[in-house]
């Protein structure tokens, strides 16, 4: 009976170590599922318009959350400084659904998302997602 317990615990240990080793060997990634509403980003005539979305890989979210839209959009390298690991740009048309696979640096702790809406003052243009490094997830 003791041999069965030892074998069982050895098996569990090896399975857990295998999962940990896989995280060390395979680069982390995240699937970002971004869906633009059909009426997104209306122009002055109320017609939907495309929107540009930036995805930032960050080591910390502090600087990202303290900056205004134009500072991040126009001077992201300057204002985010050492927190910025990488940046992706995605352009979405009204009604479009985009699944983007981001291969992330092991240093990435957060994803900062900025949408360049026409009416920034009345928009929810910023989103921050804490990266789960223990698994590979889809963020919507």
PLM region spans:
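Short acidic/polar inter-strand loop motif in beta-rich domains
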Residues: 117-125
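Bacterial signal peptide processing site
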Residues: 20-23
């Amino acid at each position: 009976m003791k041999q069965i317990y030892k074998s069982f615990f050895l098996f569990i240990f090896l399975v857990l170590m295998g999962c940990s080793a896989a995280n060390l060997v395979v680069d982390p990634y995240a699937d970002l599922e971004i869906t633009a509403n059909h009426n997104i980003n209306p122009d002055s005539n109320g017609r939907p318009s495309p929107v540009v979305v930036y995805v930032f890989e960050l080591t910390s979210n502090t600087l990202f959350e303290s900056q205004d839209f134009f500072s991040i959009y126009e001077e992201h390298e300057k204002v985010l400084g050492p927190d910025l690991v990488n940046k992706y740009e995605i352009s979405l048309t009204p009604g479009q659904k985009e699944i983007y696979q981001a291969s992330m640096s092991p240093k990435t702790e957060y994803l900062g998302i900025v949408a360049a809406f026409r009416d920034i003052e009345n928009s929810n243009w910023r989103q921050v997602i804490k990266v789960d490094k223990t698994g590979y997830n889809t963020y919507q």
